C-alpha cells in the first residue's frame, strides 16, 4: 500500500511543532500514561487516569459547545481539564472558569445532591507568566476575606507557565523541568519523564510519528475550512440573508442537524413566522 504524500508546507509545519502546539498536544494526550505523568507532576502526587479524551467537545446547558484540549477522569472520579495556551490573547481566567462550569454541569448526573456535584481541576499551561509574579506554578484558592481561612467547593484551578524557572523545592523543580520538554523540540528526559519523552520522541524523531502528525495537521486544516464555511452559512441565516433550508443543503446537513449546529455555536435560529388571517387576504 502506497504511503500518503504530504505537501511541503504540511511537512514544514510538522517539523516546527512542540507540545505547546494544540496539534501535537492533542496527539500527546492520546496516551493515557502521558496524561497521567503530566497531571501527577503538576499536582505533586501520584494519580491514576482511567479515561482521557483529547480535544473533547462538550455542551453547556444552553447547547453551546466548548472544545477542550484534554479532559481526563481520575480513579477517584475527579475530572481534570488540561489546557495549553501559547499566545497571550485571551481572558485566561474567564476561560478557566467557563470550562470548569461546563464540565461540572456536563458531568454531574441529574437529580443528585449538591455534595455529589462533579469535582473539577483545571490545569492551564502557558508559555508566558500569566500573573507576572515570577512563579512557575500558581494555585488559586477560595479564601474567606474576614478570617483568611481557605474553603473548598470541589473546583481547583492551577496555572503553570514555561517562562519562569524555579528550583527552590521538588514541585517547582519538577514543573520547571517538565516545561522544558514543552518548549524545546529536541529535548527529552526519559529518566524523569519516561512516558512524555517516549511519546514526544515518536512524533519528533520517527517517520511513523511524523506521518501521524502530518495527517493530523491536514485533518485540522480541513476541519477549519469546513468550519469557516459553516460559520458563513450560520451568519447568513441568522441575519436573514439566507433561507435556512438553502443553507442546510449547502452544508450537506439535514434541516434539524443544521439548526442544532447553529445553536451549538451560539447562533440564533430564526423562527418561522406564521401568516395571520389578515395577512393572507
Language-model features: where?
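Accessory alpha/beta interaction modules
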Residues: 1-156, 166-168, 273-281
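Interfacial alpha-helical end/capping and short helix-turn segments at domain and membrane boundaries
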Residues: 161-162
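Short, charged alpha-helical interaction segments and adjacent helix-coil junctions
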Residues: 2-15, 23, 79-85, 170-281
